[in-house]
Amino acid sequence: MECCRRATPGTLLLFLAFLLLSSRTARSEEDRDGLWDAWGPWSECSRTCGGGASYSLRRCLSSKSCEGRNIRYRTCSNVDCPPEAGDFRAQQCSAHNDVKHHGQFYEWLPVSNDPDNPCSLKCQAKGTTLVVELAPKVLDGTRCYTESLDMCISGLCQIVGCDHQLGSTVKEDNCGVCNGDGSTCRLVRGQYKSQLSATKSDDTVVAIPYGSRHIRLVLKGPDHLYLETKTLQGTKGENSLSSTGTFLVDNSSVDFQKFPDKEILRMAGPLTADFIVKIRNSGSADSTVQFIFYQPIIHRWRETDFFPCSATCGGGYQLTSAECYDLRSNRVVADQYCHYYPENIKPKPKLQECNLDPCPASDGYKQIMPYDLYHPLPRWEATPWTACSSSCGGGIQSRAVSCVEEDIQGHVTSVEEWKCMYTPKMPIAQPCNIFDCPKWLAQEWSPCTVTCGQGLRYRVVLCIDHRGMHTGGCSPKTKPHIKEECIVPTPCYKPKEKLPVEAKLPWFKQAQELEEGAAVSEEPSFIPEAWSACTVTCGVGTQVRIVRCQVLLSFSQSVADLPIDECEGPKPASQRACYAGPCSGEIPEFNPDETDGLFGGLQDFDELYDWEYEGFTKCSESCGGGVQEAVVSCLNKQTREPAEENLCVTSRRPPQLLKSCNLDPCPARWEIGKWSPCSLTCGVGLQTRDVFCSHLLSREMNETVILADELCRQPKPSTVQACNRFNCPPAWYPAQWQPCSRTCGGGVQKREVLCKQRMADGSFLELPETFCSASKPACQQACKKDDCPSEWLLSDWTECSTSCGEGTQTRSAICRKMLKTGLSTVVNSTLCPPLPFSSSIRPCMLATCARPGRPSTKHSPHIAAARKVYIQTRRQRKLHFVVGGFAYLLPKTAVVLRCPARRVRKPLITWEKDGQHLISSTHVTVAPFGYLKIHRLKPSDAGVYTCSAGPAREHFVIKLIGGNRKLVARPLSPRSEEEVLAGRKGGPKEALQTHKHQNGIFSNGSKAEKRGLAANPGSRYDDLVSRLLEQGGWPGELLASWEAQDSAERNTTSEEDPGAEQVLLHLPFTMVTEQRRLDDILGNLSQQPEELRDLYSKHLVAQLAQEIFRSHLEHQDTLLKPSERRTSPVTLSPHKHVSGFSSSLRTSSTGDAGGGSRRPHRKPTILRKISAAQQLSASEVVTHLGQTVALASGTLSVLLHCEAIGHPRPTISWARNGEEVQFSDRILLQPDDSLQILAPVEADVGFYTCNATNALGYDSVSIAVTLAGKPLVKTSRMTVINTEKPAVTVDIGSTIKTVQGVNVTINCQVAGVPEAEVTWFRNKSKLGSPHHLHEGSLLLTNVSSSDQGLYSCRAANLHGELTESTQLLILDPPQVPTQLEDIRALLAATGPNLPSVLTSPLGTQLVLDPGNSALLGCPIKGHPVPNITWFHGGQPIVTATGLTHHILAAGQILQVANLSGGSQGEFSCLAQNEAGVLMQKASLVIQDYWWSVDRLATCSASCGNRGVQQPRLRCLLNSTEVNPAHCAGKVRPAVQPIACNRRDCPSRWMVTSWSACTRSCGGGVQTRRVTCQKLKASGISTPVSNDMCTQVAKRPVDTQACNQQLCVEWAFSSWGQCNGPCIGPHLAVQHRQVFCQTRDGITLPSEQCSALPRPVSTQNCWSEACSVHWRVSLWTLCTATCGNYGFQSRRVECVHARTNKAVPEHLCSWGPRPANWQRCNITPCENMECRDTTRYCEKVKQLKLCQLSQFKSRCCGTCGKA
């Protein structure tokens, strides 16, 4: 830790202090302040605006040391600079404008955002690329980066948060609020899809309001975006966004990017105006716009100041409230605006005590009482709980809670709720009756009622409550059945009665009931007791009886009483009328007549009411067969008026009559199923449903058939729909786990977890992690928690056991095991695999020990190295090498590397690879005998191998050759080859310098980079070897075939080329050359001129290849017997060289004459030989093909040699510039087929080609003859047209016509001495680097119309230049244009009122009436302009007869007039040019409608007498059914219905209409009659037994619940006190609560009573507190005697009318408040001398406001003296 010295003045002290600041530890300074003096004052700010820095110093008071910092910094002047201030960094750069830099003045501009040193002052000279660091650091307070608040202090960039504090990391949220939580804005995202419209050219995409941030819109499609703006002042603007760039629109920066298929619009914000993004439709296709931005919440809650105190003295309280504030208009608005945003949380009111001073003894109005000092706070008060909404199963009970205030007299009044918000509001609802509802409990079944066959069994079902008590209240609908059938396995032999009692006739059953008393059964039933005696002894009285609900318990054979609601069915009458005879007092004498009269009168009384039929009810169905029921009414026979049904005798009620109705079949209709659940909960899911066309044949049989969809006339409802089309909330989406980091011992596996949001269109949007509120799933987890197998842990080698001579080194081994917890533990050594002895002990060798008394001579070890280079050409299993050289080998070869060391023991030899010690492994064997073996080479084996024998060291470099004869890139190694080879014996520095010099041999500018030259000595021969491998050093075709692993491929190669096997017999496995030979070549090349170096390098490489082959063949020839040498001629066919140079190796001089028939047939091959370099001054030039001849003034003769081999012997011919050479006395063909030119002239310049031909093929080689070395270009004068091939290649000078999308290669073969440099031009402009240039050729990939033009190749060297050109024409085949507006406009102009149609490749159709004319358009584009030919019915239209037509607009429009049936059909236009053809079609159809009678429709009924079949009548157009309205004018065929299915119908249930509900609310019952009827073929419906219908269908229900809604009503409380707001003199408002409740008093939501008229909840009332009015005082004196600035004021207050005391102003708010100030003395001043016009001028002067014009003019006198 450095000491803190005493502060001394100067910049050096500040600099050192800041260094101390950066080196201090992070301990708190407060712990160490005891030795420090107090902090000094803050320095002045480094800037006056824009954010600067200020510092403070302190000194150390101790003589020892003080820990901590002696300087501290803070930000200052954090206010925005005015626009004219400019950039702070730019000001510092401009300060150097008057200082010369290198003797010249510059205008300096700032260079910002330097990633390496942002706090240095780097500036750029205006108008140049010169960038200079003018100062090592900028002034304190300069921003590090333009888009960051971080600032530079003492040359270092310090972090600054958005709170402008140093070291703060707080940032702005998406709303622009520093350290905000994002609650002041909301994310808006959406998608807009344009709709093609002929009448609508543009549309609004989205409106982005003022203040929005982070806006991004992406348009995909052909349409175009543009902007409309509107500022807060109402100024409107528009920006068309015509080009890519960054614009300033209404002071908002807009970044716009325009692409061929999309447009991107970005605005960082905040926006300074309202932006409306609009889209301009192009009309070609739909476009989609996706947008996202953060919209500010402009309405926010704002906490108010405290309200006035509730008491003026003696202690009161005051509260705050919250008001909704509009940030745009800066005004308070209604609260509903803030409730619109869920993010807005209304602040809770704050409460504080106030006016705690005691009240004065008397204020003149009242005597102070003790209770005046007590003022209780408002409180919540609740009403009693209402009755529970449910008697069981959990209900709700509620109460009203209101805020009340108690005055000093104890009167309680309701006040606004906000006054009680300082405490939690009491709950207004709570659960109640949460115990279970009564449930049905079924007991065990009784035994079967029969002993054989089928019978019945019964059980008791009781309603049990939650305490286990028998009670009522269970739902009858859910009651389990109490009776079921049972079968006894014993058969019955007694004949049974055919019909059960239930099936007997009604009157027979009634007789049975009268005769038999009701008996108790095992099913609950009503059991009436006997009638009581008549209540009177004479006359008409009543009788009563008890009716019980009883059940027979079969298991106990006892009768149990049940609640009445346990029995089903109507309850028997418990009361009836009775007649006890006349009440005359005398016993009459029996008189039959009188008796008849008496009882006859009673009979007449009974017969006064009777049942009668009154028509039928409405048909129950509108189609498909319904039923009508005869209406039976009880009528008064005398008045014929309806009476109550109980007045008629029930037993005499006539039977029910039913008849069928509306038997016509229902039309086919769509049957729609229910929607399935949505497949997704958000982010657009799908719902499906079944929709099918059905036809109801018979309602009584419920017979329905499914029809084809086209038979339903109505449009088919949708079977699928989107659902939940809203954005999902952001959620975490984890990816798959990655593989474990370990295979055992406890590893870790990771995965990527992204925060994404599934959008309403199904796509996913990746969001920042802060958007996902849920906890983030784990990104990593433990894995492979099992223990690892035991392994050896080896220590370092110990020192040698001796100080000289031979010794040993040892190391220890520990058996270690990695546990699943990740910790290691030592285990028993038996658990580890056996350890080789060599792994724990090895020999070591130090300096030889000196023998005492005898002088000795030191002989250091020596390694016999071989300085050779090896190049493997054929696969071989194993190769042996000696260290000291370089080897370029094929993969999978085994290598044995020997280290022949002398004067050292073999076991002491050690091996290294790339500087790392090598030990034996399964792949590399380090033998103790001084050699190293590598098994099957792989790329990682490439590198530098070093053998060490004591101080002696030798290296061996191994590199691999890939399958494409390229050197394999070496993997990364810890040490470079340069570092390893630098340790070679014999001066590493000199070797390195020599290597670096030789590396430059192949480099001339960019070519060195292109060849990838080596950067270390281990790669110095790589370029030569690569050239040998790539440029035909030996027959590559034979090598490639031999490299194949499959022996079958070798056999194939031998069969195809019989000479290949002979060549391979003489081809070496490895080519060997001396390193010094390669060093000589590199040295020779370094001495050549730079422009000829590449040319000679190719020459020397080819000679090197010949030498290698020749030395190998000569060595092999000496090993063969003479006979073998005579019969083994080998000729190696050369490999064509890129540059024209080649090597020719002939190992037999027998020529073509030798061998005779023994030689195999082979194609011609011209031998490429290398001649000596031509001397320009030679008079006779003799050369071989493949070179360049330069004609000089002294050249007398040129001899061009052409030697070819092949069998049969090839024929030689010569050509010049592609044309056959015309021999003359000056141009001669020699006997050896050489071409000689005597006295060459300029006309002889050109490319001469030797062609060798026999029956098997041909070969050709060219040679260039130039004039004095001038450039020569091989040209071709031909036109190439390409429409199909993917690539085309031509020589310069040709004309190319090709379609788009192909690759075009233009060859520019040049010659000249020195070699000419090629430059390409397009339309006389030089082509840049992006074009593909290779060896003089120009490659144009994927050509388009923009590539069309004139391409020129210029060849230039020291002797001149030559330019040749090729014209490239892009053909565009005929195709349909994407924009059809032009052809449509052409059709509209040709025939404005004529129907028209455009042709298309797939064909279009136009339907016309007979006699009309039509226009057919053929939209086409192409280059050249296609020629259009029209056809009709496949024949040229010019040959069509009977067709009136005109061809217009150069063939693009065909007008056909007076169409008829013969002229309709297919019209086609054929467009063709050089690039292709296109056929488009359109059909003209003459429409004609007619009626068609089809098959009979389905029978309208399946039975009965109403079934008919109607013949189906359809309106057709060209055999296609259309709307029948089209056939309205056609004669309709007469059709007659046919009767069908006239037979008896099976029995079916007939139901009547439902009766009226028994209750209007609270749950009632509806009933209807259900009978079994049978419809005869005659149409008569008769009742039958119910069993006949039960077999067909289940009996319909005859009772159902209705009007289940609760019975509700409005209820209200009593009127509250008259303490509401004043609305006039003496008038206030009082309130009462109005709520919805059931008749039982249960409170319900108000919506339940919405159908009922709601009582008023407020009314006006008389209030003494509202006896108030505004009182004003007199106006004060005017503040000025003249001018425009005088004003006067007065006091305005609200006072009580009786007491004349001031009261709160809100009590007078019902009337307008008088003005409390006004202008005055608005008259011009008479004299214009400088004087004050207001009395406030002294304050103006004290506040230094005189510089403001409005104050200076009014205080002229005072400010003039200032």
UniProtKB/Swiss-Prot annotation:
Glycans are attached at W39, W42, T48, N251, T312, S391, T451. Residues 33-82, 376-424, 436-493, 522-584, 607-665, 666-729, 788-850, 1545-1608, 1666-1726 form the TSP type-1 domain. It comes from the Eukaryota. Expressed primarily in adult skeletal muscle. Changing W39F: Abolishes secretion of ADAMTSL1. The keyword Zinc does not apply. C-, N- and O-glycosylated. O-fucosylated by POFUT2 on a serine or a threonine residue found within the consensus sequence C1-X(2)-(S/T)-C2-G of the TSP type-1 repeat domains where C1 and C2 are the first and second cysteine residue of the repeat, respectively. Fucosylated repeats can then be further glycosylated by the addition of a beta-1,3-glucose residue by the glucosyltransferase, B3GALTL. Fucosylation mediates the efficient secretion of ADAMTSL1. Disulfide bonds are present. Residues 1120-1164 are annotated as: Disordered. Keywords: Disulfide bond, Extracellular matrix, Glycoprotein, Hydrolase, Immunoglobulin domain, Repeat, Secreted, Signal. Residues 1726-1762 form the PLAC domain. Pfam families: ADAMTS_CR_3 (PF19236), ADAMTS_spacer1 (PF05986), ADAMTSL1 (PF24484), I-set (PF07679), Ig_3 (PF13927), PLAC (PF08686), TSP1_ADAMTS (PF19030), TSP_1 (PF00090). The record marks W36 as: Not glycosylated. One of its GO terms (molecular function) is hydrolase activity. Residues 861-963, 1164-1266, 1286-1369, 1395-1485 form the Ig-like C2-type domain. GO terms for cellular component: endoplasmic reticulum lumen; extracellular region. Changing N251Q: Abolishes N-glycosylation. Reduces secretion of ADAMTSL1. Monomer. This is ADAMTS-like protein 1. The lineage of its organism: Eukaryota, Metazoa, Chordata, Craniata, Vertebrata.
